[in-house]
């Protein structure tokens, strides 16, 4: 039953998310104001990382079989027809893209907070920015280590090739050993970004709103900043809501070696779920983008009226 549901879900999820991200990229490139250059590039990279995450997730469609020892990674997607190394590397690419997206969304909050401060020290800001980005490089290093030690060795590839003599349903692409150092690092990075960033983001939101109320910002400017910071804060909290329940279940089930098919099949689905809403949150919370959408809608309505009106007169 789970496989039947997911065989429909993954294509539908791809069709729903990717066009909205492409539309957002177009609007960012075409309609971002000059004062929005830094945020423009951050939003672009965030969108690209989400496209990569969604695409690779749909290609691998993994199931982490936590009741087996060692824990096996099963691939149900099209990449099961390729070598296990390609699918295993894609599995980590998906993780990296998710971490990049989460970290850059938080970085957007931090930079917006800095933009509302009167006095800022550039050297300190650069250091904090690098610290915020550091989880990306740490996770990438740990994932590269696992690919080099677990994926590339010929004996491991030969072993997986023997196991995967029949890939009509799925392929085993690798193993998860939670007690190895790289796996521990990856687990801490992912859970850290999910747990810590929302709390700090909420604090920065509070400070940003306090800054715009105390500093000499116009009413319009205050409304724009408030709408933007509220939207980005919501983005930071979405992974916490979607990810923590299933990840907590994963850790418990991995330790107890209990099989719960729902958790195994839908783990990667729930991790990606925030990306369904992210483009619409940005399009609504960033005033120039929202106004452009409203302009298109009004233009479309006028065109519809102009097309219908002559026919109505002819009928009269």
Swiss-Prot record:
Superkingdom in the source lineage: Eukaryota
Topology of this chain in the membrane: Multi-pass membrane protein
Main localization, broad class: membrane
GO CC annotation terms, alphabetical: membrane
Compartment annotation: Membrane
Family of this protein: Belongs to the nematode receptor-like protein srd family.
Protein name: Serpentine receptor class delta-45
Gene from which the chain derives: srd-45
